[in-house]
């Protein structure tokens, strides 16, 4: 019994000595924020949740986020412009860099601070990642728990250019898929889409002033010996 008590006490002290990174190892945010300070309890989204924002630009960011709950949860948090009290409050902090944000989540409210709409948008994408995966669904998830853990997050981009290239010149994809890719880019805080529209395989963009670009250039015809040397056993025919 004595040894069991000692082991229990040692375990408790070891847990207290763990750094915050280990205490929040179950929290997955991509990319990893600059700092995360865990809190106590959870904030729960419901039909009574409301946003208070300072202007219409912030309101548009909040409405796009609220729309996720419309399909997945069956309720839509309302957005109020100019109000001072709300469950989720947007506050402009000019001391923060562009795209940076501070996020304070408590069981009673969420305070979002940023210097521009990009920062407010990325803060909500962090909350989006903290919510259950059901938030990405198109049908109401009856049993989902729309809670996020209490914490304080400070984040700013390490790189100004964070890009993804999509090669639509050689690999065709439906428009709906491309729009979904753009949505996922925003969630992962990737800020630049590089559309690879034209390649040697073919010209894909219709320009009415230059119809031959698509009539001829849209297809590539192999012409042996015209672009590369033709290797024949015993000798090499050069261009």
Residue ranges and their predicted role:
Residues 20-159:
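Contiguous, structured surface segment used for ligand recognition
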Residues 96-239:
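Feature activates predominantly on carbohydrate-active enzymes
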Residues 11, 18, 73, 211, ...:
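Amphipathic alpha-helical interaction segments
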Residues 5-15:
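Bacterial N-terminal signal peptides
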